[in-house]
């Protein structure tokens, strides 16, 4: 509760820093990893029981996913990729803060421009992960299947390509810088809306936690 209150205070007082965002990111990663670790045994059992036909269907879904992502995020010219990325971020931020002001919109454009060809590394790493998952599924009766699936679900970062590892680090730094600047440029109404959204999210998470217990 104290940690959640800290988020409220930070948002309301407009005191957002790079180090604070790094801490929150680490907490989120740890929570995601913990959840993934909890479901891994059941996932391994389910995956091992799949038939060859089901695995073939899964691989077809992977292939379709990659085609769609390449068509949407890689085929457009770079200038269009940058513009569309900025539009997607503007939409996400507006949901949390309300309409962005001109200075904030300009900062979002600068953020998207700085990321450049990040889509290329993102899609390449997605294909890399899917290929490793398919390779593991092809040997799902082997003795090392469980640890391979755990690595794919829990320790995904250990399987990233070197290029994507660097790109992800750069992307995270750019995102933190963007958020710090946006909060610095935010209005009291935007900060109030953000606190309300955080409160609602916390209530939803608490409700889910109660259902699980």
Region spans (language model):
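Charge-rich (acidic/polar
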Residues: 1-213
